[in-house]
Amino acid sequence: NFGENAGHGNLLALSPYVHPYDFSSEGAFYNMMSYYFRFAQKKKLLNDSTIVILPEYLGTWLVAVNEKKALYKDTSVTDAMQRIALSNIWSFGWAYLNAKGKNKAEDAVFRMKAAKMLAAYQHTFTRLAKEFGVTIVAGSIVLPQPEVKDGVIVLHNGGKLYNVSAVFDRNGK
């Protein structure tokens, strides 16, 4: 905690301590994130001028959303990515055929999971922004050619993968 409250708003950088299970579902991700927001609220660090900044790649780990429980016990990212591919072999195979990156397997996993990742990311940060009345610079997420249309993020699955971060205003847009 640095600085003093001058009543003009503040930047609040949160770096949550996460477990693999925190990315197991949209609900688990929301619960983990809301814990930190409630803590900040309790400490009177949030007001309608607060901008909450979250770390790079936070949303990228949503690649694990809705996977088998064994995945959350894997000890390496490589093992987890292989398990995701094998658990979704047909979807992975199709995505692999359309992969564009240097690492086709990794590219395929992110393309295959993009819609579910985005749903959990967008719903969670929209909800948190509205609930706590703050602007959120959400942690980054790897998605195929994302674009904001009418206040929501949309994907272009044939496009390149980008590591992006979205800003959600106090109204969740």
Model-based region annotation:
Residues 1-173:
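Hydrophobic structural segments
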